[in-house]
Amino acid sequence: MDKSKRLFLKSKRSFRRRLPPIQSGDRIDYRNISLISRFISQQGKILSRRVNRLTLKQQRLITIAIKQARILSLLPFRPKAQRFKKAQRFKRSQSTV
């Protein structure tokens, strides 16, 4: 093959196939908190389909299950707020000039 055609060839990279996040035996249900909590972010938001790598149908079922679990207070609407220590503010000393 001459050099001009060699420039357009792409190198074949090997890739590792990722396992699906929901196995065939897993049941998407609002009572299955261990499964549902994998699809919630640190802030308590429902993660997007791209992040989850779910199908449209699975994402819809997960979203409905999360909302049901929140309403039935199995999951919090907001996670517990982290308590930050407030820095002590120093008062200005008044100087007489």
UniProtKB/Swiss-Prot annotation:
Localization per Swiss-Prot or TrEMBL: Plastid, Chloroplast
Primary localisation category: plastid
Any GO MF annotation of the entry: structural constituent of ribosome
Gene Ontology CC: chloroplast; mitochondrial small ribosomal subunit
UniProt KW Membrane keyword: no
SUPFAM superfamilies listed in its UniProt record: Ribosomal protein S18 (SSF46911)
Keywords from the UniProt entry: Chloroplast, Plastid, Ribonucleoprotein, Ribosomal protein, RNA-binding, rRNA-binding
One of the GO biological process terms: translation
Cited Pfam families: Ribosomal_S18
Alphabetical list of NCBIfam families matching this protein: S18
PANTHER family: 30S RIBOSOMAL PROTEIN S18, SMALL RIBOSOMAL SUBUNIT PROTEIN BS18M
Subunit structure: Part of the 30S ribosomal subunit.
Protein family (similarity comment): Belongs to the bacterial ribosomal protein bS18 family.
Protein name, as recorded: Small ribosomal subunit protein bS18c
Species, as recorded: Oenothera glazioviana (Large-flowered evening primrose)
